[in-house]
């Protein structure tokens, strides 16, 4: 019997959030201001696009943190769900105050 399995979008979003939170320099994730707009948005087949909204730790280098989030999220989604995103967009919405 042949078939395929897919992972629900909310599970992929949870995986992406977990991976992002592990990156040094990420103080947290920022929920959207509109209803049902989470901190992680997944779109396209097999999580082709992932968009994360983060709060950056005070003094953390935004470019380096963003690149590390991109790498870790892509690697983690591929390892856990077999879906490597084509794009991982990291949006810094807030900076944590010391």
Specify the residue positions occupied by each region the protein language model found.
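N-terminal presequence-like segments and adjacent domain-start helices
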Residues: 1-18
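Short coil/turn segments at secondary-structure junctions
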Residues: 3-4, 56-60
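Short, non-transmembrane amphipathic alpha-helical segments
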Residues: 62-81
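A short amphipathic beta-strand at an alpha->beta junction
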Residues: 79-98
């Amino acid at each position: 019997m042949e078939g395929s399995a897919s992972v629900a979008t909310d599970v992929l979003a949870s995986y992406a959030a977990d991976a992002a939170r592990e990156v040094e320099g990420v103080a947290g994730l920022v929920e959207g201001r509109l209803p049902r707009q989470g901190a992680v948005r997944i779109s396209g087949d097999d999580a082709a696009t992932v968009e994360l909204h983060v709060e950056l730790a005070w003094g953390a280098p935004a470019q380096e943190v963003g690149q590390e989030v991109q790498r870790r999220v892509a690697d983690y989604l591929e390892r856990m769900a077999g879906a490597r995103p084509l794009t991982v967009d990291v949006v810094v919405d807030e900076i944590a105050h010391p």
